C-alpha cells in the first residue's frame, strides 16, 4: 500500500472516530480529557476516566475516551483527544529559512461541550433546566521550547486556544492558555522509557457562558430559596485554573500506558454560584488511564 493510500485511509478513520466521539458529547462531563500528546507519532488509544457529573459537581462517574493522532504529511496532522478534534495546518518544513516552524503548531479546533440533564446524582440539579450539548469551533496555537539536553521530549509546550459556540448554546468566546513541562525520566519502569508531564493553565469564558452554566434564573430560582427570588447572573473572565499531570510508560515498540489527572479550581463568579456552593464543589478532578498503540 502506498504512503498516500495509507494516509488517506487513516485520515478517513480519524474523521470517523472523531465524529463518533463528538456525537457522544452529551454523555461526557468534561470537554477536555487531561492528556496532551508529547510527540507526533501516529497513534490510536482508548481510556477510562472519572469525571464530574456536571461542571461544578460534587459527584463523579466513569466515562470512556478515545485518542487518535494521524500525520498527513510535512508536519500536518489530525488529532482527537476525547471530545476535542484538532487540525494542524502549519507545515513542519517550508525551506531552510523557516526551520523554526518545526516548533510551532497552529490550526483549527472543534470541541463538544456536554449537556447537563437528569442523569446526575444530585436531586436538585436533576430538576433544573436541561442544558443541551454545545459544539465549539475555534483556533489554537502552540510553541515547543526545547530544554537542555539531547532528549527531544525534554521541553516546555506553551499553547492557547479560543473557540465560539456553533449552535447558539451561549454567546461570546471561551479560551485557554497553558504551559506544560515534559520530562523524560532517565530510569523508567522495568527499564522502559518513562515520560512525565505537569502543566498549569487558565480558562477564560464570556458572561453568557458563565450565565449559561453557572447562572440561576427562571424556574430554577424556586430550587434555590436562599436567593430570595433574585436571579444569579455570573460575569465572565477568569473562570478557573487547571493543573494537569501525567505519566506515560512505554510497554513495547508499539504500546504505551498513560496515567493522567487534572485538578481544576473554579474561581470568581463561577465558584460563587449556588449551583457550586450548595450543590457542588469548586474543586474539580479528572482521573484516569489510557492504553495507546503506535503505528
PLM region spans:
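Transmembrane beta-barrel domains of outer membrane proteins
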Residues: 69-71, 86-90, 97-98, 140-146, ...
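Short loop/turn motifs that connect adjacent beta-strands in outer-membrane beta-barrel proteins
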Residues: 30-41, 75-103, 146-155, 169-171, ...
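Cleavable N-terminal export/targeting peptides
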Residues: 1-41
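Transmembrane beta-strand segments that form the barrel wall of outer-membrane beta-barrel proteins
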Residues: 44-52, 76-86, 122-126, 154-166
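Transmembrane beta-strands of outer-membrane beta-barrel proteins
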Residues: 40-46, 66, 78, 104-108, ...
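Solvent-exposed loop/turn segments connecting transmembrane beta-strands
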Residues: 53-62, 89, 131-134, 163-174
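Outer-membrane beta-barrel "beta-signal"
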Residues: 65-67, 281-295
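Outer-membrane beta-barrel transmembrane domain signature
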Residues: 31, 145-149, 163-258, 264-271, ...
Amino acid at each position: 500500500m502506498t504512503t498516500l493510500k495509507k494516509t488517506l485511509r487513516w485520515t478517513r478513520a480519524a474523521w470517523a472516530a472523531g465524529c463518533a466521539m463528538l456525537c457522544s458529547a452529551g454523555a461526557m462531563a468534561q470537554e477536555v480529557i487531561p492528556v496532551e500528546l508529547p510527540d507526533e507519532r501516529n497513534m490510536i488509544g482508548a481510556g477510562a476516566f472519572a469525571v464530574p457529573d456536571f461542571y461544578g459537581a460534587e459527584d463523579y462517574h466513569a466515562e470512556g475516551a478515545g485518542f487518535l493522532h494521524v500525520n498527513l504529511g510535512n508536519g500536518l496532522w489530525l488529532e482527537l483527544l476525547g471530545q476535542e478534534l484538532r487540525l494542524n495546518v502549519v507545515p513542519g518544513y517550508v525551506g531552510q529559512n523557516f526551520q523554526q516552524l518545526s516548533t510551532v503548531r497552529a490550526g483549527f479546533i472543534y470541541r463538544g461541550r456536554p449537556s447537563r440533564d437528569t442523569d446526575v446524582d444530585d436531586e436538585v440539579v436533576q430538576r433544573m433546566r436541561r442544558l443541551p450539548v454545545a459544539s465549539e469551533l475555534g483556533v489554537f496555537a502552540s510553541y515547543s521550547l526545547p530544554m537542555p539536553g539531547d532528549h527531544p521530549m525534554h521541553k516546555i509546550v506553551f499553547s492557547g486556544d479560543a473557540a465560539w459556540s456553533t449552535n447558539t448554546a451561549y454567546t461570546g468566546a471561551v479560551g485557554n492558555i497553558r504551559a506544560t513541562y515534559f520530562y523524560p525520566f532517565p530510569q523508567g519502569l522495568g527499564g522502559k522509557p518513562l515520560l512525565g508531564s505537569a502543566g498549569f493553565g487558565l480558562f477564560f469564558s464570556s458572561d453568557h457562558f458563565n450565565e449559561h452554566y453557572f447562572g440561576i434564573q427562571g424556574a430554577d430560582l424556586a430550587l434555590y430559596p436562599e436567593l430570595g427570588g433574585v436571579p444569579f447572573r455570573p460575569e465572565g473572565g477568569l473562570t478557573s485554573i487547571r493543573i494537569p499531570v501525567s505519566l506515560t510508560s512505554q510497554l513495547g515498540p508499539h504500546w504505551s500506558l498513560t496515567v493522567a489527572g487534572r485538578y481544576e479550581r473554579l474561581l470568581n463568579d463561577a465558584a460563587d454560584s449556588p449551583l457550586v456552593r450548595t450543590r457542588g464543589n469548586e474543586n474539580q478532578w479528572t482521573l484516569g488511564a489510557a492504553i495507546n498503540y503506535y503505528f
